[in-house]
Amino acid sequence: MCGSFCTHSRAMEALEQVKARFAHVVPIVSEYTAAADTRFGDAHDLMREMMRICDHRVISTIKEAEPIGPQKLLDLLIIAPCTGNTLGKLANGITDTSVTMAAKAHLRNGRPVLIAPSTNDG
């Protein structure tokens, strides 16, 4: 989950649907999402709710995301919402956030990444 804060409530609904269908769901958020309180919600509350839904700690740092590749932790990585900033970083191989590191680490195993862009660019 990236910092498209106005879409977090819809992303959380989707997370609940994913968790209802799959036993093991690992939540991953950008550092900014993990720390920023906005008019759309409190970061601490969002992290707590993600842990409740997934029954798994939230990955929110590059260091925590790095083992995803070597340990082959995921079958599918969903980035929802994916900001334009994160999308640009992914397109250019920039891995300076927990989400972009998770994607790079996951892709190195030839496994799929599903991206749900959320931008206000039209």
Stretches found by the model and what they are:
Residues 1-122:
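A cross-family phosphate/adenosyl-ligand binding-site feature
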